[in-house]
């Protein structure tokens, strides 16, 4: 279905949500017209347009597909499908099964400008200074790419940074452009076509902020450059994933992450490892031995300054706050559709249950505070609860469950 094509009698109908969510379009079908409905990028299904369609249509079978089911806005996607997870594959498993292109990740230190390390509060002039531009170009040339020519995506921290850096690259002989949410879909497709072309009007790089985090498929990308702070492990993997599609004449993708003095730097090893336990010792170990944990030919390397910046972020971050722990708990609860058991935290690679002990004393105490519907046969006396808290915090915390 498109704005011009309305062949509603076809056996298979493909449509964007923008088109089919229009009332005059979806109501041209009976609510039981479709036997099966497949929704791609289903993590967006919390939007009114998706919910309107799912409320209307009553197919025999709904299938949702997404690379990031755990949304950053806490909407429970799993609940839309009765918590029925047919198949789940994470980065490590995908690499083990050769579903993705091998990658070489380089975490390198971003530049100090006038003796100051770039961070979230850095002045814009420092982000686009000649010194930083030359530093970026030097590193991307050094680490290279696979293929006859570079076809790169550059993720920036703001629209203005993307625009100015693109101009600076062009002034130095590169052919680049910047794309933001303000650009039409037509222009985006035109620029992507130039990026993947092997002759004629070609682009070396597209500078952007977040419009390519999801919903775009450019297998030819052979270099991904990260020039922004890591806000979440979900976004990190989304941006990393832009280069992981297999393509002819691409043996691997190069990921170059410019690591400044960002407070969320600890999320980088968390995202790469896929370890959601948030155990600080585990995160530190991955930082020095990351390549050992990634299957196949992929490699992970951090330079010494980047390591120190990430170690510092690990030391400073508080992973035992009530807000953080309840957020991670809710992710697992949403996936299961019920209150998790002890073993669920390990079986589903969720947060280390010891983090819960640290904030609440014991899992029992946590649930009595967090879950109104939590019922335990024979409520513990205060003395018994205190004893359980003592065992949890003093004995169990001394070793991994």
Predicted feature residues:
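Conserved helix/coil segment N-terminal to the catalytic DExD/H
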Residues: 3-36, 47-52
């Amino acid at each position: 279905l498109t704005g011009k094509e309305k062949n509603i009698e076809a056996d298979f109908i493909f449509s964007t949500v923008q088109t089919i969510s229009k009332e005059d379009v979806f109501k041209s079908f009976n609510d039981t017209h479709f036997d099966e409905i497949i929704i791609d990028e289903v993590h967006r299904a919390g939007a009114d347009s998706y919910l309107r369609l799912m409320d209307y249509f009553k197919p025999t079978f709904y299938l949702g597909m997404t690379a990031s089911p755990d949304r950053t806005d806490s909407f429970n996607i799993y609940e839309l499908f009765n918590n029925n997870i047919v198949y789940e594959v994470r980065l490590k498993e995908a690499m083990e099964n050769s579903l993705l292109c091998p990658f070489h990740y380089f975490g390198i230190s971003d530049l100090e400008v006038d003796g100051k390390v770039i961070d979230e509060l850095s002045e814009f002039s420092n982000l686009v200074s000649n010194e930083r531009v030359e530093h970026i170009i030097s590193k991307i040339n050094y680490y290279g790419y696979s293929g006859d020519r570079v076809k790169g995506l550059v993720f920036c921290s703001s629209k203005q940074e993307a625009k100015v850096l693109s101009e600076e690259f062009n002034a130095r002989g590169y052919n680049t452009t910047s794309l933001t949410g303000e650009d039409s879909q037509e222009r985006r497709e035109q620029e992507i076509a130039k990026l993947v072309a092997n002759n004629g009007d070609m682009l070396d790089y597209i500078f952007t902020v977040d419009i390519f985090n999801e919903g775009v498929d450019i297998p030819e990308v052979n270099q991904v450059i990260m020039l922004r702070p890591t806000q979440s492990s979900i976004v990190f993997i989304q941006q990393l994933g832009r280069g992981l599609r297999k393509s002819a004449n691409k043996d691997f993708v190069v990921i170059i992450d410019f690591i400044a003095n960002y407070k969320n730097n600890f999320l980088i090893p968390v995202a790469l490892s896929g370890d959601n336990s948030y155990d600080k010792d585990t995160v530190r170990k991955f930082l020095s031995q990351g390549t050992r944990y990634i299957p196949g030919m992929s490699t992970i390397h951090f330079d010494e300054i980047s390591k120190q910046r990430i170690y510092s972020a690990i030391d400073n971050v508080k992973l035992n706050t009530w807000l953080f722990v309840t957020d991670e708990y809710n992710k697992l609860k949403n996936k299961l559709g019920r209150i998790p058991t002890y073993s669920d935290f390990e079986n589903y690679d969720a947060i280390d249950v010891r983090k819960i002990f640290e904030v609440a004393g014991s899992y029992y105490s946590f649930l009595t505070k967090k879950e109104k519907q939590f019922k335990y046969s024979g409520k513990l006396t205060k003395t018994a609860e205190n004893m359980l808290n003592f065992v949890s915090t003093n004995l169990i915390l001394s070793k991994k469950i």
